[in-house]
Design a protein with these regions (language model features):
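Beta-strand elements of modular eukaryotic interaction domains
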Residues: 3-5, 65-66, 104-107, 131-133, ...
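Flexible, glycine-/basic-rich loop-and-beta segments that form/coincide
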Residues: 160-212
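The AdoMet/dcAdoMet-binding core of the Class I SAM-like
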Residues: 1-83, 88-100, 123
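Class I S-adenosyl-L-methionine
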Residues: 129, 133-183
Length: 212
């Protein structure tokens, strides 16, 4: 919505996808965006294969991979859960969703495209592995803490610029097992079997010291 407002370019095309559950009032879906959607005909809502917009569905990944393969100049990912009763474990709980968002982004990202994704704490092996993966796939990776984000809030944004890959299909196929277990309660402990370079881990520790 912000990018659409700033660019004011009717030739742009925006695709939005989020979880839709009409039986759960805690899932906002697009209820608060009706006016925005009415006023911007170049914004399209994607519900994917199962019509729920669930990013943890393998069928939905395959659907979006086929439909939008290597077509997106800019991808943003701002998904999350309600952590109001369990702030201390939001990094672990969100790990699978964050990884799924990264996989979706890789599946649709155009070469030289950019990706913006929200992380929370970045202390666990899983988080460091995901950041290392992004550093391999994009030319430049930056951490950003917006002025509007409270200091006590662990959220931070990772800006990834200049996607390196011409074709990501083979890589995406290797991530299919991540989607085999549909439970959001199954957390990701690590991604790589190899050891992440110590220099990279050291840089993440420095960033954690700055942002907390």
């Amino acid at each position: 919505e912000a990018m659409c407002h700033l660019r004011q370019n009717k030739n742009d095309h925006y695709i939005g996808i989020t979880l839709i559950d009409k039986n759960n009032n805690n899932v906002p879906g697009w209820k608060k965006s009706n006016l925005f959607l009415e006023n911007n005909a170049n914004v399209f809502i994607e519900t994917a294969a199962d019509r729920t917009g669930n990013l943890m569905s393998l069928d939905n990944l395959k659907y979006c991979q086929k439909k939008y393969k290597q077509s997106m100049d800019m991808v943003t990912a701002d998904g999350g859960f309600d952590f109001s009763i369990d702030f201390n474990h939001q990094e672990a709980v969100s790990s699978k969703l964050i990884l799924c968002q990264i996989i979706f982004a890789i599946a649709v990202q155009k070469k030289h495209g950019n990706f913006l994704i929200k992380f929370f704490d970045t202390f666990t092996t899983a988080s460091i592995d995901m950041l290392y993966l992004l550093s391999l796939l994009y030319e430049d990776v930056y951490f950003v803490k917006p002025n509007s984000s409270r200091y006590a809030n662990s959220e931070k944004y990772v800006v990834c610029k200049n996607f390196r890959m011409d074709n990501s299909e083979e890589l995406i196929n290797k991530f299919y097992p991540v989607f085999n277990n549909h439970s959001v309660n199954v957390n990701i402990s690590e991604i790589f079997t190899m050891r992440t370079p110590y220099l990279f881990i050291n840089k993440i520790e420095e960033i954690n010291a700055i942002y907390g």
